[in-house]
């Protein structure tokens, strides 16, 4: 039978799982105009408020004046500019690694790195709640693919003990994007070491946010390159720009340049984006008060949510999901918040497990106390108290 997209769409809509795009008509900020209506934005990943920072915007403009818009080719042809190279060196220094390598997106970084490091005859071990890009990398690598219970180092240890593969790659998020919890990295690092496995961490939601200097989840736990030899980070969240990178040893990066297909066979990022990111990285390092303000905002929101009876886990970062349950109920809560002037997305399967649809609330250093208090007041009216 020929595939019928219309029938498939009807089935998605019947499950309240249909997703649609909304049109943003303003820069990313705590206040945005979306579909023609002003909203206070509590669903962006712009954790430090850098996406619309004047210095970052100015660096982008200067980059366009210096480099033009497009890079013109892949990094290995003629698209690797001095701006790209300088950013890679600065990211390597920031993460405490000998080298770093830019990728066009976080999805491409994860897909490329996992599939380059593991293949037929190897085994990839992944947390069940890893980001889709990590899971897809494992599935498409050709390696045997095993998923262990979420944040369960003992389950990973048992899986490694059963493996006879010569090459073993353990892959985890640092901060889980839909749940906001941290991977137990010290335990995972010990298990990976004892199990003769590489450990790869995607710190998309930890970089810039966690740790005294914003170096991410590894800094938060006091870990470094010996424990986590493969580190992936994104530029499109706390750093406020676009793209991603992997940081590691000289030999790792040189190998990925040769073998990571999502690096080799795609056009390089616009050099102006690299110039803007160099400035945002400098701001991350020179303005620790942004992280402190974010922590204060997270504490304020969590205290208010607890006083309203909402159950939140032990989540130290800006991702504070409120699990609703049914798809229709999450959509209705999001709609009610919109009526009160707040933008909070309803996250539904397949992004999260069935029966755990949620409001994914994200805090920014740029949010004011008044905006946070207003959201809490709106949540009290929009969300059932048993959530």
Swiss-Prot record:
Required cofactor(s): pyridoxal 5'-phosphate
Annotated pyridoxal 5'-phosphate binding sites: 106-107, 177, 205, 234
Pfam families xrefs: Aminotran_1_2 (PF00155)
Record's keyword annotation contains Transferase: yes
Keywords, ordered alphabetically: Biotin biosynthesis, Pyridoxal phosphate, Transferase
Function according to Swiss-Prot or TrEMBL: Catalyzes the decarboxylative condensation of pimeloyl-[acyl-carrier protein] and L-alanine to produce 8-amino-7-oxononanoate (AON), [acyl-carrier protein], and carbon dioxide.
Protein name in UniProt: 8-amino-7-oxononanoate synthase
GN (gene name): bioF
């Amino acid at each position: 039978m020929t595939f019928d997209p219309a029938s498939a769409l009807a089935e998605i809509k019947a499950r309240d799982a249909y997703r649609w795009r909304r049109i943003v008509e303003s820069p990313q900020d705590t206040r945005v105009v979306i579909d023609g209506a002003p909203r206070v934005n509590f669903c962006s990943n712009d954790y430090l408020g850098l996406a619309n920072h004047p210095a970052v915007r100015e660096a982008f403009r200067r980059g366009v004046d210096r480099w033009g818009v497009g890079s013109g080719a892949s990094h290995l042809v003629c698209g690797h500019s001095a701006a790209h190279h300088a950013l890679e060196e600065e990211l390597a220094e920031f993460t405490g690694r000998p080298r770093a390598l830019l990728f066009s997106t976080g999805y491409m970084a994860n897909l490329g790195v996992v599939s380059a490091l593991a293949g037929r005859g190897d085994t990839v071990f992944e947390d069940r709640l890893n980001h889709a890009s990590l899971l897809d990398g494992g599935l498409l690598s050709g390696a045997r693919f095993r998923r262990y219970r979420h944040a369960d180092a003992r389950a990973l240890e048992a899986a490694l003990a059963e493996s006879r593969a010569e090459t073993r790659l353990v892959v985890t998020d640092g901060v889980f994007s839909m749940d906001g919890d941290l991977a137990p990295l010290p335990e995972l690092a010990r298990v990976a070491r004892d199990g003769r496995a590489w450990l790869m961490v995607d710190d998309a939601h930890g970089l810039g946010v966690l740790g005294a200097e914003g170096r991410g989840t590894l800094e938060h736990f006091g870990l470094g390159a010996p424990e986590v030899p493969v580190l992936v980070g994104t530029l499109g969240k706390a750093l406020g720009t676009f793209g991603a990178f992997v940081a590691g040893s000289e030999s790792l990066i040189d190998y990925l340049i040769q073998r990571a297909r999502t690096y080799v066979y795609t056009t390089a990022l616009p050099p102006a984006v690299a110039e803007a990111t160099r400035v945002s990285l400098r701001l991350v390092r020179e303005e620790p008060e942004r992280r402190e303000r974010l922590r204060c905002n997270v504490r304020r929101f969590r205290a208010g949510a607890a006083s309203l009876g909402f159950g939140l886990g032990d989540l130290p970062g800006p991702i504070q999901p409120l699990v609703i349950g049914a798809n229709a109920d999450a959509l209705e809560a999001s709609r009610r918040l919109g009526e009160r002037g707040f933008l909070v997305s309803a996250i539904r399967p397949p992004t999260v497990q069935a029966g755990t649809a949620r409001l994914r609330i994200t805090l920014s250093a740029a949010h004011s106390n008044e905006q946070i208090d207003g959201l809490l007041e709106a949540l009290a009216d929009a969300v059932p108290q048993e959530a």
